[in-house]
Amino acid sequence: MLVALKLLYAWLLPPGIFLLALLVAYCFCRKTKNEHWLVLIFALIYLLSIRVVSDRLIKSLEDWYDQPAVSVIKDVQAMVILGSGSYDGAPDFDGVGQNTESATVRLGTALRLHRALHLPMVLSGGNLFDDMDAEAGIEYRFLRACGVEDRYLIKEDRSRNTAENAKYVKQIYQQHHFKKVILVTSAFHMPRAVALFQREGMNVIPYPTDYKTDKKLRLNAFAFTPSSDCLYHNSLAMKEYLGLLAVKMGWQ
């Protein structure tokens, strides 16, 4: 009964409700010149909103780099944590401005790495608009509240995208004479991040986190049920592949 209710909810919430609306429209528009467009739109939305498609697409990015064991990480001087957006002005435990879900997972991973390796942490992330708080400042406040000493934290608060993350972190990399750093970001984002950091001449060890997929794809009813999460994950993956193309073509 519980499974049946969850499946019902999935079809009554977006995007499922939109697909049902298209089916109803198709019933009224059969044998008209617009019939094939409804079929095409339905198929496109459906395929982009089911887990069996989204998991395969985003997993192709997440599997690009393995997460290394801490015991094999050697000869590194710092770690770089890339921001992933923030909720500007949102009330937080000890201030205002809150990290997004992905940014919080990245910080949680970096915090555990810091406790294991005692490395300086470069927090990279600025603000898109002048009246917003920089991501690095919000991350700094979070890590200080978690007990990380100020001497371990380096803020890079000018970057607005991944290309600028790499550009401005390079200045810190050179200023502190780093030779190798750990790069912490979401697994789906890691291929593009590594490409941009390597283009700037930095030696990085990828440490992916914030995985969006299970280790093994589960083929059950939910894998073929429309979900807004799957639409979002597909958009993330497509954005990353377009970004990789832009890097390769020199557009970014």
Kindly label every feature range from the protein language model.
Residues 1-27:
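Membrane-embedded alpha-helical segments of integral membrane proteins
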Residues 3-8, 53, 57-61, 238-245:
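Hydrophobic alpha-helical segments of integral membrane proteins
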Residues 51-224:
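A structural signal for short, hydrophobic/glycine-enriched beta-strand patches
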Residues 25-26, 49, 247:
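Structural signal for membrane-spanning alpha-helices in multi-pass inner-membrane proteins
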Residues 12-18, 203, 231, 248:
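Alpha-helical transmembrane anchor segments
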Residues 28-36:
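Membrane-interface helix-boundary motifs at transmembrane edges
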Residues 218-222, 230-252:
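Extracytoplasmic/luminal low-complexity segments enriched in Pro/Gly and acidic/polar residues
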